[in-house]
Amino acid sequence: MITRSLGKNGPTVGAIGLGCMGMSDFYGPADRSESIATIHAAMDAGITLIDTGDYYGMGHNELLIAEALKGKDRDRVVISVKYGGLRGPDRSWLGVDTRPAATKTFLAYTLQRLGTDHIDIYRPGRLDPNVPIEETVGAIADLVKGGYVHHVGLSEVGAETMRRANAVHPVADLQIEYSLISRGIEDEILPTCRQLGIGITAYGVLSRGLISGHWSKERTASPGDFRVHAPRFSTENIDRNLALVEALRALAGAKGVTVAQVAIAWVLAQGTDIVPLVGARRRDRLSEARGALTLSLTPDDHAAIERAVPRGAAAGPRYVAQQMAALDSERGRATAG
């Protein structure tokens, strides 16, 4: 597999990464055996970046990855972990805690669950409004000095926060949503990353399956699937958004590829400093996503894609209002497109 560097300070990884969240949380039940087989298939295909969060399934996701990596060469993978999200026993969200003591405590439990002596990239999942980013990054920097963490990462923060964080310790990458229908980072965040030499790991490249080509208006989200409440999947927005998908389907059909492959290839084409995370829970979906790596989009293709899905064309924001308000990356932005 072709490789990309996560910024000037980060590791070299396969050009796409595997996001494991859906194997444990937010999308309804997943088949454990198939999830593990998918992780193995990703490794066999040369995918090295494995992304998780300690709050995905309240530790379940880390334990799942540990099981998948049992007997494997630890050096074959780059493990990215988000932390700081507080969960209740009813799976509710209770806020964020990235105080230095909490940062080190969360890591201790993560190392135990994953059965490893280090995490390659450690990042707060969200900005803690009660803790200066300098204190949070300073704590991770201490963990880097101790050998427990190799690189500092960030998630869903704005340009100013990135600058402040990077002044404390070099930041490898920013994990943030980026797709054909979520392009807000192009205004200020992406240029700032490039100025600072910070890479991008892009999640939501298929907008939670909305622009995968596999979603339909008739499809019903399973119990525990957060798309039940996602604005872009709502009754008032789904028709408009699926019309965009159909426009992409026509383009994909003309090239003999799938909608998902076009959407992922578009993200890949936005710069070699961007590594898309694909949230495949099954081997067939992973195989489809990998097909984007060999899809070359011509200038005419890009122009056609822009006409089919112009920036801001999607109906609805990427999260509900309360979640959007909590995103440092969205502060000061007029729109969420």
Q: Which residues make up each language-model segment?
A:
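N-terminal small/glycine-rich loop or linker at the start of catalytic domains
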Residues: K8-Y27, S80-L94, H118, R123
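Aromatic-lined glycan-binding groove of carbohydrate-active enzymes
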Residues: I185-P223, T258
